[in-house]
Design a protein with these regions (language model features):
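Conserved alpha/beta enzyme-core scaffold
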Residues: 5-327, 331, 336, 340-400
Length: 400
C-alpha cells in the first residue's frame, strides 16, 4: 500500500505536466495498469473515459474491425466537439460527423469500401462547409500515429513532397491559432540536418486523449489479441492517455500465456475492457464474422439524406435534373421514364406519403432505440447474426 501511494504521487506529478516522451506517457498509464480487472460495461467505460473536446483516435480500417459499439454508445451519451484522427475511416466516423459531434477531422480516406466510395455525411459536411477537415496521404497519417506512440515532437517525411497536399490546407494557419488542440502547421519543408541541401517535410504528431479499439480477444487486465491485420491500433493504444477496448470475447490470463506471441496490445496501455459481441457490426471482424452486406447497403442508401427535409430537397433537385435531361432528348423513352419516376418520388416525399429512409432514421433504428449492444443484437436477431459468422478454420462465412 505504501509503494502504491508513492507510485501514485510520482505518476500524478508526471500526469500534471501532460508532456514528455513515450516512456513518460507509458508510466502515466501504468498507474491504472496495476488494476488487474478492467472489465466494465460499455456505458461506464464511455462515461468515464470519453469527454467533450477529446482528441479521439479510432481503430480499424474502413469496414474492418471498426469500434461501432463504442461509437454508438458515444452517440447515445452525447459527448461532442471531438478532434478525430482515424486511419482510413468508415461509417463510424461518418455517424459522428453526421450527428455534429466532430469539431475537426484529420484523416486520409473515409468510406465504406465496396459500398460507398466516399462516406456521404462526411462528404456533405465538407461540401456544405460544416466540417473542419485536414487531409494527409494515408502513408503519412499512419506514420504520424506511429510517431505519437513514440512520443516524437514532429515527424520528418518525404512522402508528400511535390504533391498538392503540401499546397492545399484544409485548416488554415490562422484558424489553427484558434484551436488549441490542433497543431499550428499542417506541414513545413525543412532542411535535413543529416544531409545538407536536402529537404524533408516536417508534419505534426497528434496528442491523443482517447483511443477506441475493437479486438477479437482481451483478458481482464487489457492484454489484447488481434487476429489479422493490426492497422494502426497498436500505435494509438500506446499513444493515447486513455484506451477503451471492446472485444468479441474475454479470455483468461492463462489463455493469453499459452501463446504470448499472439499478444498485440499490452494491458498497461488499456483502461477499460468491454465484452461486446459483434461490436464491429455492420463491419467485419476477422475470423469471427463478415461485414453485413444488408446493413452496409442500408446505411449507404439512408445516409444520402440527413433527414426528411433534406430528402425532399434532394429529390426535388433530382426531378429537375431529370426533366432537364429529357428536354434535350424528348424522344428518349429511358429518359422519359426516369423523369416520371423522379418527379413521382419528389411528389410522394413532399406530401409525406413516402419519404425514403434517412440518416436520422438509421440512427434511430440501430443506435438510439437500442439501450445497449445486447439490445442491438436482439433487434438484429440470431438468424441474421449466424449468417455472418465465420466458419472455423476458414476465416469467412459460407452462408453470407
Amino acid at each position: 500500500e505504501a509503494c502504491m501511494s508513492i507510485f501514485r504521487r510520482i505518476f500524478d506529478g508526471i500526469h500534471a505536466s501532460r508532456e514528455g516522451s513515450s516512456a513518460i506517457k507509458m508510466f502515466i498509464k501504468i498507474r491504472e495498469g496495476f488494476i488487474l480487472n478492467k472489465v466494465m460495461s460499455l456505458h461506464d467505460a464511455v462515461a468515464k473515459y470519453v469527454e467533450n473536446g477529446d482528441t479521439l483516435a479510432i481503430g480499424g480500417f474502413t469496414t474492418n474491425r471498426k469500434p461501432y459499439a463504442t461509437v454508438s454508445e458515444i452517440l447515445r451519451q452525447g459527448q461532442k466537439d471531438f478532434i478525430v484522427y482515424a486511419g482510413p475511416g468508415g461509417g463510424e466516423v461518418d455517424m459522428l460527423i453526421g450527428e455534429g459531434r466532430v469539431a475537426a477531422y484529420i484523416n486520409c480516406y473515409t468510406a465504406n469500401s465496396g459500398y460507398t466510395n466516399v462516406s456521404r455525411r462526411f462528404r456533405a459536411a465538407i461540401e456544405q462547409g460544416k466540417l473542419t477537415y485536414e487531409d494527409y496521404s494515408q502513408d503519412v497519417l499512419m506514420l504520424m500515429l506511429h510517431a505519437s506512440s513514440l512520443g516524437l515532437p514532429f515527424l520528418p517525411v518525404r512522402l508528400m513532397q511535390g504533391s498538392g497536399l503540401m499546397k492545399f490546407w484544409g485548416i488554415s494557419e490562422e484558424k489553427r491559432k484558434t484551436m488549441p488542440k490542433i497543431e499550428n502547421l499542417k506541414c513545413v519543408e525543412i532542411e535535413n540536418p543529416m544531409v545538407p541541401g536536402q529537404k524533408v517535410v516536417a508534419v505534426p504528431v497528434p496528442k491523443i486523449d482517447t483511443a477506441i479499439i475493437h479486438v477479437q480477444q482481451a483478458s481482464p487486465d487489457g492484454t489484447c489479441i488481434i487476429m489479422g491485420d493490426e492497422f494502426h491500433d497498436i500505435d494509438i493504444a500506446i499513444a493515447a492517455r486513455k484506451t477503451i477496448v471492446t472485444c468479441e470475447e474475454i479470455v483468461s490470463d492463462e489463455f493469453i500465456r499459452r501463446d504470448p506471441t499472439k499478444t498485440r496490445i499490452f494491458g498497461e496501455c488499456v483502461q477499460a475492457v468491454v465484452k461486446a459481441p459483434y461490436g464491429a457490426w455492420p463491419a467485419q471482424c476477422y475470423d469471427y464474422y463478415d461485414d453485413d452486406d444488408a446493413g452496409l447497403k442500408e446505411y449507404d442508401k439512408a445516409s444520402k439524406y440527413q433527414d426528411a427535409e433534406d430528402a425532399v430537397k434532394q429529390l426535388e433537385k433530382a426531378a429537375a435534373k431529370a426533366a432537364k435531361a429529357l428536354e434535350k432528348a424528348p424522344e428518349d423513352e429511358k429518359l422519359k421514364l426516369a423523369a416520371e419516376n423522379a418527379q413521382k418520388a419528389f411528389e410522394l416525399a413532399k406530401s409525406g406519403e413516402k419519404i425514403p429512409e434517412t440518416f436520422k432514421d438509421f440512427l434511430e433504428k440501430w443506435v438510439y432505440s437500442c439501450e445497449d449492444q445486447s439490445a442491438l443484437l436482439d433487434k438484429l436477431g440470431g438468424s441474421r447474426l449466424m449468417r455472418l459468422k465465420n466458419e472455423p478454420h476458414l476465416g469467412y462465412s459460407t452462408t453470407h
